[in-house]
Amino acid sequence: MTDILNKILTAKAQEVAAQKAAVNAEHIRALAAEAAPVRSFIGSIRGKHRLNLPAVIAEIKKASPSKGLIRPDFRPPEIARAYENAGAACLSVLTDEPYFQGSPEYLKQAREAVSLPVLRKDFIIDEYQVYQARAWGADAVLLIAAALEREQLERFEAVAHELGMTVLLELHDESELEKCRNLTTPLWGVNNRNLRTFEVSLDQTLSLLPALEGKTVVTESGITGKADVEFMQSRGVHTFLIGETFMRADDIEAEVGKLF
């Protein structure tokens, strides 16, 4: 595990402890049970595939640890509507505040503005956060294999599925496959950013494809335009999580539209 990931996870543990002190586990479960009905994240992706279209998970991201502030003019409802109008399948919204300048309010605002399903993009280290995600209105959660042990992955997935949510499992390399082998989610993402060097290469996804036969594979990071999309589709990958390319565009709707 890298130093930056360790730092993020240490801070996240402190954050979750404070959140539990403010809203206890019983209360967050009750809020999750009362949340708006789940929108099918995996269903929306499969709907695009049935139309022979790339399924784009479009990300709402203000900043990142490596790039700093990405989009100063940051209005989640407007961004969400641009994504929906352009044909995105789903949204991904950063809720981590210390490192990505995210917020649960951004997730709520984005979901209220559109009919698309929404992923909570964060560092999930406690099942409390899965209930929390549903309470905020999220339809899917990200589980990062590099950040979790086998037992945590299996438990958090079970909680998400009990709540009707989709799980996007994120891998970085083959070493993480073994601890994920009992997971049942159909949605397996590969982050093309090398955790050691932070270099981005689509080869990360390609190298894992043989091991992910039968899964709906999401390629994450490093997709910069239609040429990348068409290249990955030629290799059998039809689902794309894209953030920074869109966030830096003057006209987000037009930028997304270029992929179709």
UniProtKB/Swiss-Prot annotation:
Substrates-to-products reaction catalysed: 1-(2-carboxyphenylamino)-1-deoxy-D-ribulose 5-phosphate + H(+) = (1S,2R)-1-C-(indol-3-yl)glycerol 3-phosphate + CO2 + H2O
UniProt-listed GO biological process terms: L-tryptophan biosynthetic process
Gene3D superfamilies in alphabetical order: Aldolase class I (3.20.20.70)
Keyword Cell division (UniProt): no
PROSITE patterns noted in UniProt: IGPS
GO molecular function per UniProt: indole-3-glycerol-phosphate synthase activity; phosphoribosylanthranilate isomerase activity
InterPro entries referenced in this protein's UniProt entry, alphabetically: Aldolase_TIM (IPR013785), Indole-3-glycerol_P_synth (IPR045186), Indole-3-glycerol_P_synth_dom (IPR013798), Indole-3-GlycerolPSynthase_CS (IPR001468), RibuloseP-bd_barrel (IPR011060)
UniProt KW keywords: Amino-acid biosynthesis, Aromatic amino acid biosynthesis, Decarboxylase, Lyase, Tryptophan biosynthesis
Transmembrane parts of this sequence: none
Enzyme class: lyase
Origin superkingdom: Bacteria
EC number assigned by the record: 4.1.1.48
Pathway(s) the chain acts in: Amino-acid biosynthesis; L-tryptophan biosynthesis; L-tryptophan from chorismate: step 4/5
HAMAP family: IGPS_B
Family: Belongs to the TrpC family.
NCBIfam families on file: PRK00278.1-6 (NF001373), PRK00278.2-4 (NF001377)
Protein name listed in UniProt: Indole-3-glycerol phosphate synthase
Species of provenance: Neisseria meningitidis serogroup A / serotype 4A (strain DSM 15465 / Z2491)
